[in-house]
Structures are given as C-alpha cells and as structure tokens.
Amino acid sequence: MSKFIEPSVEEIKLEKVYQDMGLSDQEYEKVCDILGRQPNFTETGIFSVMWSEHCSYKHSKPFLKQFPTSGDHVLMGPGEGAGVVDIGDNQAVVFKVESHNHPSAIEPYQGAATGVGGIIRDIVSIGARPINLLNSLRFGELDNKQNQRLLKGVVKGIGGYGNCIGIPTTAGEIEFDERYDGNPLVNAMCVGVINHDMIQKGTAKGVGNSVIYVGLKTGRDGIHGATFASEELTEESESKRPSVQIGDPFVGKKLMEATLEAITFDELVGIQDMGAAGLTSSSSEMAAKGGSGLHLRLEQVPTREPGISPYEMMLSETQERMLLVVEKGTEQKFLDLFDKHELDSAVIGEVTDTNRFVLTYDDEVYADIPVEPLADEAPVYILEGEEKDYNTSKNDYTHIDVKDTFFKLLKHPTIASKHYLYDQYDQQVGANTIIKPGLQASVVRVEGTNKAIASTIDGEARYVYNNPYEGGKMVVAEAYRNLIAVGATPLAMTDCLNYGSPEKKEIYQQLIDSTKGMAEACDILKTPVVSGNVSLYNETKGTSIFPTPVVGMVGLIENVNYLNDFEPQVGDKLYLIGDTKDDFGGSQLEKLIYGKVNHEFESLDLSSEVEKGESIKTAIREGLLSHVQTVGKGGLLITLAKLSAHYGLGLKSSIDITNAQLFSETQGRYVVSVKSGKTLNIDNAIEIGLLTDSDNFKVTTPYTEISENVSDIKQIWEGAIAQCLTTQD
C-alpha cells in the first residue's frame, strides 16, 4: 500500500481529477488507451504536464513546421535546449528565447528572475558559456498602479538574477499598451559561445548508464507550473502563487560553473536542464531522444523536506537543477565535482532498454509509461480560424499639430528612453560588451578574438493585430535591420510566439497568418529558426493581449575594429534611406490621435530589405558611416530626436515630406550619418541634414518647422518613465 495519500484511479476518473490538471476528457481517454488501463495519480500528473500547451505545442506545432530550420551556419536546430550556429574558427553561438509571462503576472520579481535563470541553464546545458542576456517586455499603460508594480518587479527580478550570476544584460525592448493590463509579457533570451567539440545533447542512452541529479533540493514550488502557463489568467490565478518558482542566482552560478566543468568529462553522455515540468520533462525527453527507457528511484532524489510524494517530485519546478546521464562506473567522478562546488547531487536511476519510463519509491511502482507516446505523441489540434475584417478606410491626419504631437509621442513610455530601467542591469560584467542597451543591437566581443556577436530582440503587436501576415514579416525584418545597423551579418533567429487563446477563431487565424509571414521573411532574409517557444492563453478576464511574436536574432561581426570610431560626430551628414509614405495604420500616431489601431498599412518588400541591408553593411565596414539608426516607432522625426538626444548633438534637417509623414512608420527605412569627408553611394539615399555642435534641434518641411533645445528634448525623453513611476506612487 502506498505511503502517500492520493486519489485512486477510480476517483480520478469519476471525479474528473484529470481536468483540474489540464487534461480534457478526450486526452484522458487517450492516456487510458496508451497505458491499456486507467492512470494513477502520478501518471495522470505526468501526462498532464507533458501534454500541456507549454510542453507539447499541441495547438502551434503545425505552424512551427513552416519555419526554415536549416542553413549554411546551422549546427543544431529545434529539438534541443537551444539552437547552435557556426561562427568560424571551430566556434559556435548558442541562443534561445523563452517566455515567463504567467508567473510574472502573479509574482513579478520571481517570475522574471526564474525566467532569466531558466534560459541561462538552457544555454549552459548545451555546454556554452553565456555571454549576454536580452529581454522583450510588454506591460499595460503606466497610469495604472498595477502595471507600475509589475514593471518595477520584473525589472528588479531580471537585474537581480543576471547581476548576481555575472552575465551582462545588454539589449532589450519594452512597450506599453492597455491590452497587456494584468498580463505582462516577459520574454528572456540568452546568448552563449562554445567550441564545436564541446556541444552537448539532452539524450539518455547506453543501457546501465547512470542518471545523476544535481542542484537545489526538490521542494513543492512550481508544481504544475507548465499547466499554469497553459491557462488563461483569471481572478483565481492569484491563488496559484505556489506555481511560481523561486530562483537562487548564487546556486545558479555554482551550477553553471560545475556544469561547464562537467562537460569536459568524456564520460558525460547527455545533460538537460530541469525547466518546465521539472524532472518529468527532462528525464522523459532525454529517454525519447536516446531511444531508451529510464528507471528512476525517487527515494534517492534530494528533497527539501520529508514527505514529498512522487507526484510532487516529478511535477515540481524547483529551480537551479540539472539532469545528467553518465557512463556506468564513473558516477563518483561527477559527484565529487558537484561536492567541490557545494551542490547537492545524487544518482537517482539508470538507462534501460525497455523504452518505458518507470518510477519507483522504495521499490513500489508509481509510474510505468511507454516513453515515446509520453514525449512525442501529445494530441495535435488543428482548429478553425476566422479572418478579421480589415479597415481599409483612411484616417485624416492633415491638421495635426506637429509640435504637440512630437512631445506627446516623445514622452510616451513606449518611445521614451529606457535607461532609467536598463541602469538597474549590469551591462558590463565580463568586460566584453562593446555596444550597451539603448541602441539598435548589442555587440559583445568573443573573448580572445577580434570577432563579436551582435544580438537583438524585437517584438511586434499592433501591426500583427491589424494584418497578421504582414506583421509577421515585419517583426523578422525589424530584427534583421537592427543587426545590419551595427554592421553584423544576420545568421539565425529564435522566436517566442505570445498570443491569446487559440480556441478563439480570430486568434487562431492570427497564429496561422503571422507565422506564415514570419516563415516567408526567414526564408528571404536567410535567417533560419533554430530554437523557440510558444506562449498561448495570454488573456485576462476574457481579454486577449495583442498577438505578439518576438524574434531574437544573432549576427556575426568578423572584425570589430570598425566599431572603434562608430559614433556620430559634429559635421557628419545625415541621409535617409528608404521611401516615406502615408503609412499610419498601426502606428503610434494612429493610437495617439484616434485611441485605437485598426487600419491597414503598406506591405513589406523583403527583397528590398536585403538590397538595402547589404549596401548599408558594406558602407559601415568600409568606414563610411559613423552611425545607423532604423526608423521605428513614432516615425522619422522621433528617430532624429532620439539620435540627437542620445549623443547630445545638435541637428539641422530639411525634408520634403508632409507634416503627418514626419510620424509615418513606413518600414524598411534607415537614418545614417556619413563621416566628414566621405561620400555615400547607396540607391534611394537622400541627404536630409547635418549634425552640429549647437544645442538646437531643427527640422523643417515645406509645411512646418520645429526648433527645440536638444537639452530639453533629452530631459523629456530620458525622464518620462521615471516621472510616470514616481508621480503615480
């Protein structure tokens, strides 16, 4: 008789306990068919987390298959802890983005901190040393105190974990809209570097080889975290605070160093982070990838307190844990290593040839499940979508007050400088950061070389909402442009798809169309998808977030020398590359004036993106340009103001466009500064101005002139977010 009091198999069926765990009636019946019997409590819990949306991608898997996943540089694509891309000289870059949205909505500090910790371990599990962190964040408007609390907690959590573990946070983006009220998006990305011969895989193979647990002792925190992340947020979600994991960056640092030492041991067979679904997902996935079975003896698992049941052990998401498979007879070598790093560790099982996932506690069987159906045969749902009616009418922007509009946009938190927040992150630890947060992309030197990795993270929402297909293309192209802007060659990308409930026809259609657009852009821009994450059911009280695909992209800079003087100077001429059109659908201007975004916008020419990108990259590397800035949120006037304010330079510009077009967000445009004495020869590049040593920012069109002090613009732009957070307290 079991020493743990749990519902019987009959009670699980009759009282539909499985529904509380996240399984539908049909899914429960499929589990019964797989087992040839009714599952017990532990088995039901295991299937519920492995078949959750968060772990199985059961609503999104068909769309993910559209993405190109191979390329000249790709060494390892989706299916492992992170993607791996060649950067030459027997080196590779390892990277991935993950969401921690639901936990951050309930417990913002720990939700964000453990999101950072988890993505770091994904990179480390491949064998790479992390070199930088990035994040993409979304919150409701800051006139709401709950949103302020969430923002403060998330930023502190990101900084608290990253700073303690010693990895710089070098890039990110933050936007604000009421559609994220109560449902923030917290997407964390990590980048690492590794030698080819050190690349690890999460596989369990070799009959008789041992399974080793290392890291924090297992507690009851985070139980059913994967299931929680697959549900809509409701008023009852606050009661699921125990589903939010607790991070310990100091143990995380020890675990990282110990793991990076363990991968140098030839006797290591496979390794995987215990992330979502904890010991369940890590062990069963390793067995599936190895074509093996596993027998875990759960009484050997290090636990934080007595009485933790097999069900709780398997579903706990206690942080800072890794699972290793090592050659039989070499266990002590690894245990001694972990003891040296003051980490708890234990041999908890072995690899078998049964292709079954067997769990025992004091010789009593608590689970006996075939590996492949558990890990690879979750049901896949293809639902019915419904096209949104696009508004093809045109709003009137002919009578806007340019100065008033300019300052309102400049101080909106989405456009305002994020330095008040980024200053809470350690941006320089490791001393290899070349370009810090706040510009187009971060650049981190590969230690001991003259190479650097450029990385960026970008999300799109309003445009995806207005036209999912075109918006999907745009988010990939935006990341591509940001890497071009620092002279990098884009290599590959990772994605995080943040959407509402796929069971709603319009949202399901958004998934269909936006991923189609993303896949097309990936193909044309030659940026294959090597890793990723899906976060669905981002809804609060029945209201969905904007569909928000996020793209993390990395690029290679073969020689960083050209960045030594890559900074705009007095006397540099300014050029605009790309046409400016009446493009206001989905823009900050449309939202400001009309209070909503629901109009169409120009389609994106991806072939033109490649042509412009290659020309600009060449000009940067030939030493012609001192700065490149993409024209983004708020349009050209805002872009020029941010350039002037960031560098404290005067600016004088004359542009032949309308007043409204100053705020147009036509895609595919760059503002570049050409070094004094140099000549720019790029098609469709128009000279628009000059950088000066004055305190004057002056932009004229045939219809208006705006002339302001740079110092005033800088004060408003840099102080807006701090003012929002202090005046509302």
UniProtKB/Swiss-Prot annotation:
Key words of the record: ATP-binding, Cytoplasm, Ligase, Magnesium, Metal-binding, Nucleotide-binding, Purine biosynthesis
EC number: 6.3.5.3
Any one GO CC term of the record: cytoplasm
Binding site for substrate: 99-102, 121, 245, 317-319, 535
Binding sites annotated in the UniProt record for Mg(2+) 1: 98, 533
Function: Part of the phosphoribosylformylglycinamidine synthase complex involved in the purines biosynthetic pathway. Catalyzes the ATP-dependent conversion of formylglycinamide ribonucleotide (FGAR) and glutamine to yield formylglycinamidine ribonucleotide (FGAM) and glutamate. The FGAM synthase complex is composed of three subunits. PurQ produces an ammonia molecule by converting glutamine to glutamate. PurL transfers the ammonia molecule to FGAR to form FGAM in an ATP-dependent manner.
The protein's name: Phosphoribosylformylglycinamidine synthase subunit PurL
Organism of origin: Staphylococcus aureus (strain NCTC 8325 / PS 47)
